[in-house]
Amino acid sequence: IVADKVGYANELQLDRQGQHLYLNETFGRCLTRFNINRFGELSAPTVVTEFGAGTFPDGLAMDVEEHLWVTSPVSNRVIRVAPDGAQTLILEDSDPDHLAAVEVAYKGGSMGRVHFEEAKSQKLRNISSLAFGGPDLRTAYLGSLLGDGIASFRSPIMGRPPTHWHFNV
């Protein structure tokens, strides 16, 4: 992505019409939308939503209702974000003490790799991506930084088919 003043660009998604690009800013702790002009240039960055303590947006997927699904590796959260920025927590597997320590490090400017690698949880191991799959696109698969498997859960909303499934050259 070619844009200024981005707080560590991570995953991105295009809207269905190809007019907007959504970007997770991990250390900016926000989801930003850019307009895309007819030449493919980005403009008018707008913060769709900001995330609070413990949420460092990483993975990004879109469902058929044009809501965005955000993963956060430090807190093992999956958050569904509506087009107006409203957030719904879908799942979380985190340790409050660890999140408090990470928040102190983040605000003090000393947050580093160790804060991602030492996340404490019951089952999930630093979820970093989400993809919808299965015959009805209602199985949400979770990739992780430290796990040795792929967790999944049934989604109440169907995921949007990836653009490349219907891309013609």
Give residue spans per PLM region.
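Glycine- and Gly-Pro-enriched alpha-helical subdomains that act as flexible
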Residues: 13-34, 38, 42
